[in-house]
């Protein structure tokens, strides 16, 4: 069985995240959206809200599930029997950052990282940009799935 972990904070889930997940469904038997929890980090949306956004967005996709975790992603992969880490790439800076992590993960384990390029229509979207638009009272509805719009 081809099982992938898609890790992130998803604060909040964006159309970019959603696009990567949708496009990965035919590639894997199971996709686990893994929300990383870091006690040192301040989040705009609660963990429960972030889980709800993802569950609602993918409610009709039985191969997609959501969990939260702490610690190393490769440890989570080993625990859940996942052989792949799924990552989206928006730009060259993402690639350089993700490449270093992928090489480290590969050195520490046998887990492969699979990169998908974001669609041109969503390549400019990041959770940071969405949070900034929200903080400044802007219309963020064109940047996020429907489930996030009705917070």
Swiss-Prot record:
What subunit structure does UniProt give?
A: Homohexamer.
- According to UniProt, where does the site described as Transition state stabilizer lie? 17
The family database entries (Gene3D superfamilies) matched by this protein are listed as: HUPs
The metabolic or biological pathway listed in the UniProt record of this protein is: Cofactor biosynthesis; coenzyme A biosynthesis; CoA from (R)-pantothenate: step 4/5
Q: Where in the cell is it found?
A: Cytoplasm
Name of this chain's protein = Phosphopantetheine adenylyltransferase
Sequence positions that bind ATP: 9-10, 17, 88-90, 98, 122-128
UniProt keyword annotation of Cytoplasm present? yes
SUPFAM superfamilies attached to this UniProt entry:
Nucleotidylyl transferase
A Gene Ontology term for the protein's cellular component: cytoplasm
HAMAP family to which the protein is assigned, alphabetical: PPAT_bact (MF_00151)
Q: Which Pfam families match?
A: CTP_transf_like (PF01467)
Q: What keywords sit in the KW lines? A: ATP-binding, Coenzyme A biosynthesis, Cytoplasm, Magnesium, Nucleotide-binding, Nucleotidyltransferase, Transferase
Q: GO terms for molecular function, please?
A: ATP binding; pantetheine-phosphate adenylyltransferase activity
Summarize the protein's role.
Reversibly transfers an adenylyl group from ATP to 4'-phosphopantetheine, yielding dephospho-CoA (dPCoA) and pyrophosphate.
Note the InterPro entries from the entry.
Cyt_trans-like, PPAT, Rossmann-like_a/b/a_fold
Family classification: Belongs to the bacterial CoaD family.
Tell me, which GO biological process terms does this entry list?
Answer: coenzyme A biosynthetic process
């Amino acid at each position: 069985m081809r099982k992938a972990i898609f890790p992130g904070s998803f604060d909040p889930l964006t159309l970019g995240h959603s696009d990567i997940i949708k496009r990965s469904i035919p590639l894997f038997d199971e996709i686990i959206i893994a929300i990383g929890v870091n006690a040192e980090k301040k989040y705009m949306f609660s963990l429960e809200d972030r889980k709800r956004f993802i569950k609602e967005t993918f409610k009709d996709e039985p191969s997609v599930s959501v969990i939260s975790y702490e610690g190393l992603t490769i440890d989570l992969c080993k625990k859940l029997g996942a052989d792949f880490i799924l990552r989206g790439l928006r730009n060259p800076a993402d690639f350089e950052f993700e490449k270093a992590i992928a090489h480290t993960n590969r050195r520490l384990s046998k887990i492969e990282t699979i990169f998908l390029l974001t669609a041109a229509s969503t390549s400019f979207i990041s959770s940071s940009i969405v949070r900034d638009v929200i903080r400044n009272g802007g219309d963020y509805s064109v940047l996020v799935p429907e489930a996030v719009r009705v917070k």
